[in-house]
């Protein structure tokens, strides 16, 4: 394990602690999930380079695609939530019914 791996693991742990302690704002949750998935993708790519295997790089590409779709859907939900309630709070998601 080298220094870059340790830094990425530390960033991932910081992101998980951010999810645990900050559950009210949906924008912060989206940013933290992007951070976590980005670090996981980088860890997969670094592991594939160290092991000389292509599957880690493909997994990193899949994670990158998934995070792009997640952010697009999440931002669409945020826009709809703000237009309906005027507040971006996770507790107001039940007001988006039908």
UniProtKB/Swiss-Prot annotation:
The keyword Iron-sulfur does not apply. One of its GO terms (biological process) is ATP synthesis coupled electron transport. Pfam families: Oxidored_q2. InterPro entries: NADH_UbQ_OxRdtase_chain4L/K, NUOK/Mnh_C1-like. It is found in: Mitochondrion membrane. One of its GO terms (molecular function) is NADH dehydrogenase (ubiquinone) activity. Its EC number is 7.1.1.2. The chain crosses the membrane at residues 1-21, 26-46, 61-81. It is a multi-pass membrane protein. Core subunit of the mitochondrial membrane respiratory chain NADH dehydrogenase (Complex I) that is believed to belong to the minimal assembly required for catalysis. Complex I functions in the transfer of electrons from NADH to the respiratory chain. The immediate electron acceptor for the enzyme is believed to be ubiquinone. This is NADH-ubiquinone oxidoreductase chain 4L. It comes from Dictyostelium citrinum. The lineage of its organism: Eukaryota, Amoebozoa, Evosea, Eumycetozoa, Dictyostelia. The gene is nad4L.
């Amino acid at each position: 394990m080298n220094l870059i791996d340790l830094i990425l693991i530390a960033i991932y742990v910081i992101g998980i602690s951010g999810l645990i302690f900050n559950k009210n704002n949906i924008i912060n949750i989206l940013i933290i999930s992007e951070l976590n998935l980005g670090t996981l993708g980088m860890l997969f790519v670094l592991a594939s380079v160290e092991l000389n295997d292509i599957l880690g790089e493909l997994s990193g590409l899949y994670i990158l695609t998934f995070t792009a779709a997640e952010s697009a859907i999440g931002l669409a939900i945020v826009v709809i939530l703000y237009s309906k309630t005027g507040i971006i709070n996770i507790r107001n998601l039940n007001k988006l019914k039908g």
